[in-house]
Amino acid sequence: HVFARESITAAKLNELFSAYSNVHIGLVPDIVMSANAILLGTTDCVAPLGILRCLRDDKEAALSAEQYSMIDKALAATGHTIEKTDTHAGGSQLNEAQCTKLLTDKLSQFRAAKLVVTDRLHGMILSLLSGTPCLVLPNSNHKIRQTQLDWLRNHPRLVFLELDEIADIATFIDSLLSVPHGRMDESPVDIAEYDDLKKALVAI
């Protein structure tokens, strides 16, 4: 069994393993979306304040300098405090306690925001786990867009904005700022989406 977390990769795997009848290709959401913030040890915070900006600055970024400027101008115009963050923690050879603290601290940071603006896959997922409304932008690969299309198309606290829509980003920011936070004991996707994975694991 080989499981992909979005349909483009699943199609590539089906093509790659087409000659091997003993290889089953499955499709399930990113495994992190099977959890929720409470299960991951995060507690609720005071009333959410400010906007969290979690945008790539590496080779996987798809935004131009002009688009970054548009985004920052629109965020500043809200009058809210803007905090910049990333989902890459750095470091290596971390023990379990250190990893747990990094994750719970990051979830708490996302929960404490009124809105998250991100082009990172796990920035989007952390937003959904924390119940915080999220404005999602594309990056240079298909993963974040296809994850949204496959599993999160109708999520009430998520808006995916294409690059040619960034000129209108202020409208989407204002709309999402009025969306209330979700509960922290809810998973972003229906747990039944993982049934095929569960069956495969039981059969091992």
PLM regions: where:
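Active-site anion-handling motifs in enzyme catalytic cores
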Residues: H1-I204
